[in-house]
């Protein structure tokens, strides 16, 4: 009775569209002890649904051949199929999905007993994690909504939260993401307040700080979901936010209390993120400028060019003052600027903002380029040189 309690498809549009765009579509349905069959050509039924045999199985098989008249190519990309089927296997613990590519006689089997925990483990492979995976499922009897969440922090600086409703991904998030974020931030703030961490460290943390390095999967099963569009890229069911927030609040608060070591490691990362954010703010202030570059404020020795059009300007980054001197003598002053950089430059891909900003050479480079840094301030249109030669 509960087989179709929740569904990704809402109106049957999917199979109708596939049917219309297929040269041929075959339906084989095992139900109530009988095998039913029907065939379509370019969306038109070839005969009514008919019984073709007996069965003790249940289920539906859909086979379709994309129309060459509609599509310029009808070759399936096995990587795209594998990615989606792996995702479905993670989202439905214990379901075994087999993908066969008969073109090259290859088979992929997706079977994950751990469900969302294994999903997080798969995403975090190769990264250093700060805590064991936190995973819970909570079903609400009054509205039929089931909330499942798995999460883990790692040593990266990116947030990776993926949201699903009835197995369908929402790349734009929605009410389930809002509920998750609210509960996560509240739970961590309450923990750090109770442990006096914020007063001790003298920092103010934000939700973004809490989610730095976080990998999380938020999956909800909703009987009657509402989306912002047919593509289902954003969930708008208001009751889901409350359901996720309540379930996450309870389970996550308990997790932090029961795992003090993990809680301290997570709090430490959040404090570091808050400090880095503050350093980034200072960096943005440093690189803000109303018009031309204030050369007097540069810690380096930029020899600027006369050209004011960035499209015609070149910046040469050279190592040390001696190379800088030679470059200045040989340059075309009209369009070529020279910036000597001393010492070994910092690998900013692996360094935090606070470390990056403490490097005088990096600071010089940021100011000379003029396009700013950070999510809010970076503007490539303000780049002062369209050619940069290292």
From Swiss-Prot:
Heterotetramer, composed of two GyrA and two GyrB chains. In the heterotetramer, GyrA contains the active site tyrosine that forms a transient covalent intermediate with DNA, while GyrB binds cofactors and catalyzes ATP hydrolysis. The record marks 344, 347 as: Interaction with DNA. Its EC number is 5.6.2.2. One of its GO terms (molecular function) is ATP binding. Few gyrases are as efficient as E.coli at forming negative supercoils. Not all organisms have 2 type II topoisomerases; in organisms with a single type II topoisomerase this enzyme also has to decatenate newly replicated chromosomes. This is DNA gyrase subunit B. A type II topoisomerase that negatively supercoils closed circular double-stranded (ds) DNA in an ATP-dependent manner to modulate DNA topology and maintain chromosomes in an underwound state. Negative supercoiling favors strand separation, and DNA replication, transcription, recombination and repair, all of which involve strand separation. Also able to catalyze the interconversion of other topological isomers of dsDNA rings, including catenanes and knotted rings. Type II topoisomerases break and join 2 DNA strands simultaneously in an ATP-dependent manner. Its main location: cytoplasm. PROSITE patterns: TOPOISOMERASE_II, TOPRIM. GO terms for cellular component: cytoplasm. InterPro entries: HATPase_C_sf, Ribosomal_Su5_D2-typ_SF, Ribsml_uS5_D2-typ_fold_subgr, Topo_IIA, Topo_IIA-like_dom_sf, Topo_IIA_B, Topo_IIA_B_C, Topo_IIA_bsu_dom2. The keyword DNA-binding applies. Residues 313-390 form the Toprim domain. It comes from the Bacteria. Gene3D superfamilies: 3.30.230.10, 3.40.50.670, Histidine kinase-like ATPase, C-terminal domain. GO terms for biological process: DNA topological change. It is found in: Cytoplasm. The gene is gyrB. It catalyses: ATP-dependent breakage, passage and rejoining of double-stranded DNA. Keywords: ATP-binding, Cytoplasm, DNA-binding, Isomerase, Nucleotide-binding, Topoisomerase. Belongs to the type II topoisomerase GyrB family.
């Amino acid at each position: 009775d509960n087989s179709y309690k929740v569904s990704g498809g809402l109106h049957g549009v999917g199979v109708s569209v596939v049917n219309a765009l297929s040269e041929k579509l075959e339906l084989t349905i095992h139900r109530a002890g009988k095998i039913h069959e029907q065939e379509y050509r370019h969306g038109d039924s070839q005969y009514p649904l008919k019984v073709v045999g007996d069965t003790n199985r249940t289920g539906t098989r859909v086979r379709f051949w994309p129309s060459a008249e509609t599509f310029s190519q009808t070759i399936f990309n096995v990587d795209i199929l594998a990615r989606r089927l792996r995702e479905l296997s993670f989202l439905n613990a214990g379901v075994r999905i087999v993908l066969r590519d008969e073109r090259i006689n290859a088979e992929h089997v997706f079977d994950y007993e751990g469900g969302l925990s294994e999903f997080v483990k798969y995403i975090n492979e190769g990264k250093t994690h700060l805590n064991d995976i936190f995973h819970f499922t909570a079903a609400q009897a009054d509205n039929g909504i089931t909330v499942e969440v798995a999460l883990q922090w790692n040593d990266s600086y990116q947030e990776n939260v993926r949201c699903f409703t009835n197995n369908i991904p929402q790349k734009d998030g929605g009410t389930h993401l809002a509920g998750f974020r609210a509960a996560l931030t509240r739970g961590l703030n309450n923990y750090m307040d109770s442990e006096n961490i914020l007063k001790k460290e003298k920092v103010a943390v934000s939700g973004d700080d809490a989610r730095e390095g976080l990998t999380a999967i938020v999956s909800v099963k909703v009987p009657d979901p509402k989306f912002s569009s047919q593509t289902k890229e954003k969930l708008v069911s208001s009751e889901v936010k409350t359901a996720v927030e309540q379930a996450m609040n309870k389970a996550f608060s308990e997790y932090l209390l029961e795992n003090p070591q993990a809680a301290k490691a997570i709090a430490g990362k959040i404090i570091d993120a808050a400090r880095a954010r503050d350093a980034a703010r200072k960096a943005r202030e440093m690189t803000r400028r109303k018009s031309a570059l204030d050369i007097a404020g540069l810690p380096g020795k930029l020899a600027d060019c006369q050209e004011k059009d960035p499209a015609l300007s070149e910046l040469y980054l050279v190592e040390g003052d001696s190379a800088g001197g030679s470059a200045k003598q040989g340059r075309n002053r009209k369009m070529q600027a020279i910036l000597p950089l001393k010492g070994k430059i910092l690998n900013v891909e692996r360094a935090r903002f606070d470390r990056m900003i403490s490097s005088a050479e990096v600071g010089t480079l940021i100011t000379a380029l003029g396009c700013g840094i950070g999510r809010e301030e970076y503007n490539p249109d303000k780049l002062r040189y369209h050619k940069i030669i290292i």
